[in-house]
């Protein structure tokens, strides 16, 4: 979360007058994050989050995202629930940006991931997948395997400036991963979060109190979401895989939804693909973002060691799972 678009007090109060959420008593911008402008609203009716969607979010996707969040909330998942105005609409315009209000979730995200976080995260991810069965509309994964060759091409001219030989290593990785990628109907599919990093999961008293930031969510292989979490939650800062965290994550997930044998066999290639996806999008931002642009760059090399680990893995035993 972050603030890129300022909102005047008068414009905000006029906007809130369309809702039945009480009178505004205070508001503040949220500094964290990289994609949208976010504000905490305090009203006489409670606390809420106001999001203004910036240019990196396709407005055409917003009804799907908001619909998914509403469905997941209806099915008991602790996630932001879109608040509708008196006219029944959740999506409006404020300060020239698409905007929506959602419910406020208590808790804080873990700055240092421990084994104790991983089982609750796995269980919450499985609960998300189960709840998502109630949402029939599909959204293609715009950053799935079909997008990776184009990202490589867009980074080719400058990618080796980040690390010599990086582009050749990415070429070799794609040559392994893409032919081995499971077909659409090979594994269970459904609605996935696709970005469940620690800063998108809130904890309170040791339990998951909320999952946020659904703006990369899409319809894809459920096990790919697990693979993303293995990358995001189960590696040390130096890129070393922590098998204890991995075991906890998988055990937590399977306490809600057991994996199929085919999903288990596919996890190494899915994890390699997930590492490739985040390496490539970080690399693209690193080499293509001009100074002063509205993007916070993250080091792509954080994912290179992860990718190398996954490429060397042959089965779940390679992960100590």
UniProtKB/Swiss-Prot annotation:
SUPFAM superfamilies: Protein kinase-like (PK-like) (SSF56112)
Catalytic activity as recorded in UniProt: L-homoserine + ATP = O-phospho-L-homoserine + ADP + H(+)
First-level EC class: transferase
UniProt keywords, alphabetically: Amino-acid biosynthesis, ATP-binding, Kinase, Nucleotide-binding, Threonine biosynthesis, Transferase
Pfam families from the UniProt entry: APH
GO BP terms in the entry: threonine biosynthetic process
One MF annotation (Gene Ontology) recorded for this entry: ATP binding
UniProt pathway: Amino-acid biosynthesis; L-threonine biosynthesis; L-threonine from L-aspartate: step 4/5
Family matches, as CDD domains: HomoserineK_II
Gene3D superfamilies, per the entry: 3.90.1200.10, Phosphorylase Kinase, domain 1
Entry EC number(s): 2.7.1.39
Family named by the database record: Belongs to the pseudomonas-type ThrB family.
Record protein name field: Homoserine kinase
Native species: Gluconacetobacter diazotrophicus (strain ATCC 49037 / DSM 5601 / CCUG 37298 / CIP 103539 / LMG 7603 / PAl5)
Gene that encodes it: thrB
């Amino acid at each position: 979360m972050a603030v890129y678009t300022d909102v005047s007090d008068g414009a905000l109060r006029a906007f809130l007058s369309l809702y039945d959420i009480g009178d505004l008593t205070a508001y503040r911008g949220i500094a964290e994050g990289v994609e949208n402008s976010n504000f905490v609203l305090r009203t006489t009716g409670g606390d809420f989050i106001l999001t203004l969607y910036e240019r990196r979010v396709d407005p055409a996707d917003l009804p799907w995202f908001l619909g998914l969040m509403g469905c997941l909330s209806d099915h008991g998942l602790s996630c932001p629930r879109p608040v509708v105005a008196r006219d029944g609409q959740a999506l409006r315009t404020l300060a020239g940006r698409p905007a929506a209000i959602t419910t406020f979730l208590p808790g804080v995200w873990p700055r240092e991931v421990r084994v104790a976080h991983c089982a609750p995260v796995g269980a919450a991810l499985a609960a998300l997948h189960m709840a998502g069965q109630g949402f029939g509309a599909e959204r293609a994964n715009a950053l799935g395997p079909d997008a990776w060759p184009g990202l490589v091409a867009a980074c080719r001219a400058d990618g080796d400036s980040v690390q010599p030989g990086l582009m050749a290593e990415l070429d070799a990785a794609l040559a392994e991963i893409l032919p081995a990628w499971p077909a659409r109907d090979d594994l269970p599919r459904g609605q996935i979060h696709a970005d469940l990093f620690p800063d998108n999961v809130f904890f309170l008293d040791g339990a998951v109190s909320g999952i946020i930031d659904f703006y990369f969510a899409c319809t894809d292989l459920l096990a790919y979401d697990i693979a993303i979490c293995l990358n995001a939650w189960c590696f040390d800062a130096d890129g070393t895989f922590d098998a204890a965290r991995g075991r906890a994550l998988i055990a937590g997930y399977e306490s809600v939804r057991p994996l199929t044998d085919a999903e288990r066999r596919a996890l190494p290639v899915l994890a390699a693909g997930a590492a490739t996806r985040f390496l490539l999008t970080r690399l693209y931002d690193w080499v293509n973002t001009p100074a002063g642009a509205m993007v916070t760059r993250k080091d792509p090399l954080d994912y290179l060691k992860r990718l190398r680990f996954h490429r060397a893995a042959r089965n779940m035993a390679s992960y100590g799972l």
